[in-house]
């Protein structure tokens, strides 16, 4: 058995991200590229980049060169609406918001209600459409520019099918099978879907940049195989690490294991109880032992969550790390600190989520970018 495994559907074990870069054939996100990002945006990098939560890429160096040369680029990401969103789902959207805000670029968010219906036997099509609405509220609450962001559901934006047809003509079954592991039991809709997922990378005649967790990388490998034959750029990607569930550093937070996840719609008080009960710490067997030997923050989910998202202050994070190692603070103190941070985040997010109900039409239909996409003809290279 491998010590860890990463696929688009499952992540198991404690991931060695350096080995994963070798396995996937991606490139480390270097300090030089991060420095270049700071120079071009003239803004301090957010913690997701400074702390290497985003750690790997494909062609991000070319994205920065395009931007510097005045060619620009655009952002593309998405969400498969199979249930409620949790903290692990939303963090890449905050990084995407920073990129949109500081590079001033367009963003396309694909809501794959069709994919989830096809790939999840227990879901109905009406069910995935309902979850699409709920998930879109969470995405809008992040704070994207409504005139530079187009959020679309595949079941509504049927123009995407017309764009997917010439893409599907380029992709053989063996290519799709090699990436996704299709077999004789795979439904024909599943086999066609990669063409639909690739279509948004051709919305503009610029390079697209996809910020996403690295387990999603296989979806874009096919696009990179044929994009240039259609007269477009290979898509670029920024890969994030995984947000661990509450009960351990292995794998990733999973919506199918409610005790490991904090959902964006959780009652803040209940979320606090969940963290207190389930969050794994790097503590010793007794308080006395911890004061003598110190804690182990590198094995601690509580510290990892602070590092990834909930403690933006570098000085405070380092002080907490050292205090833990020196036995100066106990696990209960850190749990209470994290609970307060998470509860404040949930309260603020849920207020913004409620306001998003009045903004959803602009993101989907009436904003500048949305209107442009609904009115636009199919790009010429895809009509040949």
Curated annotation (Swiss-Prot):
Instruction: Note the Gene3D superfamilies from the entry.
Output: HUPs, Tyrosyl-Transfer RNA Synthetase
- A molecular function GO annotation: ATP binding
Q: Which InterPro entries match?
A: aa-tRNA-synth_I_CS, aa-tRNA-synth_Ic, Rossmann-like_a/b/a_fold, Trp-tRNA-ligase, Tryptophan-tRNA-ligase_arc
Q: What Pfam families does this protein map onto? A: tRNA-synt_1b
Q: Where is the motif 'HIGH' region annotated in this sequence?
A: 81-89
Catalytic activity line of the entry: tRNA(Trp) + L-tryptophan + ATP = L-tryptophyl-tRNA(Trp) + AMP + diphosphate + H(+)
* Chief location category: cytoplasm
State the compartments where it is located. Answer: Cytoplasm
Q: Which UniProt keywords apply?
A: Aminoacyl-tRNA synthetase, ATP-binding, Cytoplasm, Ligase, Nucleotide-binding, Protein biosynthesis
Record's GO cellular component terms: cytoplasm
The lineage's top-level taxon is Archaea
Q: Which residues form a coiled coil?
A: none
List its EC numbers.
6.1.1.2
Motif residue range(s): 'KMSKS' region: 252-256
Q: Which GO terms describe its biological process?
A: tryptophanyl-tRNA aminoacylation
| Record HAMAP family | Trp_tRNA_synth_A
Give the UniProt family note: Belongs to the class-I aminoacyl-tRNA synthetase family.
Under what name is this protein listed?
Tryptophan--tRNA ligase
Source organism of the structure = Thermococcus sibiricus (strain DSM 12597 / MM 739)
Gene that encodes the chain: trpS
């Amino acid at each position: 058995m491998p010590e860890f495994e990463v696929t688009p559907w499952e992540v198991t074990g404690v991931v060695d991200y350096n080995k994963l870069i070798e396995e996937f054939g991606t490139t480390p996100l270097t300090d030089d590229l991060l420095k270049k990002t700071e120079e071009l945006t003239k803004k301090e990098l957010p913690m997701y980049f400074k702390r290497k939560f985003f750690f790997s890429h494909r062609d991000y160096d070319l994205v920065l060169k395009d931007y510097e040369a005045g060619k620009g680029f655009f952002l593309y990401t998405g969400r498969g609406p199979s249930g409620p969103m949790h903290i692990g789902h939303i963090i890449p959207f905050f990084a995407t918001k920073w990129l949109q805000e500081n590079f001033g670029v367009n963003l396309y968010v694909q809501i794959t209600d069709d994919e989830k219906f096809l790939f999840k036997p227990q879901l109905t099509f009406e069910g995935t459409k309902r979850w699409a609405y709920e998930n879109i509220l969470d995405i809008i609450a992040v704070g994207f520019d409504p005139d530079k962001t187009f959020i679309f559901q595949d079941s509504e934006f049927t123009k995407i099918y017309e764009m997917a047809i010439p893409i599907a003509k380029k992709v053989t079954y063996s290519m799709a099978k090699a990436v996704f592991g299709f077999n004789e039991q795979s439904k024909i809709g599943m086999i066609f879907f990669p063409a639909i997922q690739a279509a948004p990378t051709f919305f503009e005649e610029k390079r697209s940049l996809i910020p996403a967790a690295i387990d999603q990388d296989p979806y874009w490998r096919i696009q990179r195989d044929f994009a240039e034959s259609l007269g477009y750029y290979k898509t670029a990607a920024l890969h994030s690490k995984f947000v661990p569930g509450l009960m351990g550093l292995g794998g990733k937070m999973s919506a199918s294991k409610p005790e490991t996840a904090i959902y964006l719609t959780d009652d803040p008080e209940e979320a606090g109880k969940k963290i207190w009960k389930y969050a794994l710490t790097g503590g010793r067997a007794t308080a006395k032992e911890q004061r003598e030997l110190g804690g182990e923050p590198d094995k601690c989910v509580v510290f990892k969550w602070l590092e990834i998202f909930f403690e933006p202050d570098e000085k405070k994070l380092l002080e907490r790390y050292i205090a833990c190692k020196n036995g100066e603070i106990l696990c209960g103190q850190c749990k209470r600190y994290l609970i307060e941070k998470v509860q404040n985040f949930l309260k603020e997010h849920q207020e913004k989520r409620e306001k998003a109900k009045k903004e959803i039409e602009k993101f989907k239909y009436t904003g500048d970018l949305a209107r442009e996409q609904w009115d636009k003809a199919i790009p010429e290279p895809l009509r040949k």
